[in-house]
Amino acid sequence: MYKGVIFDFNGTLFEDYDLQQEAWRELIRKYFGRDLEDSEFRSSFHGLGNVDILAYINSLDPEKQFDVSITDEKEIAYRQLCREHPERAVFIPGVEETLDAMKAAGIPMAIATACEISNVNFNIETFRLERWFSRDMIIYDDRTFPSKPAPDVYLRAAARLGLDPADCVVCEDSYNGIKAAEAAGIGRLIVRRTEPRIESIYHDPLIYAFIDDFVGFYPKYLL
């Protein structure tokens, strides 16, 4: 049986794929006058930290160079979209029951997210994450280490749990997160479907299962 679980947050425990995409789409329209293609979002935005996204944005047009204020602008727009759609600010079905059961069983748990601190604080408050995770068990993009697909965030999460990465299950939804988990030597990977035909997009031998929700997740996927 695997000893601990590390969760990505956005898109994994909380379905916000389209809200994230819309927030970035608004900025691409504003500054580049074009739409953000689905494939472009998936490869160059989804699951990446803002430092890497900023580097990508600055590669689009040599005459248009931005600083972190553009990513800050996006996060403000994203949080506003969440506030405008409170019906969307809910966990994926089965998440609360799974977290309750794992906490009661003493299973070590952490969150490893590409979010920066402003969104981490927003998520802690909105979802009352302190019910299951102390702040030191929420590892986020503090710009001191490379973001996904680098393995650092998952290596740090496993270390916080006091576990070898091979003894951990990771729950992810993005290509970059999948590659990060693989590079970290994670023992088992569960991928939540965030788009149609995801199985045909993501091919990785580490993937144990694709899921739509967390109903019946524990203990099934730790065994």
For each of these PLM feature ranges, what is it?
Residues 92, 107, 148-150:
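Hydrophobic alpha-helix-in-membranes signature
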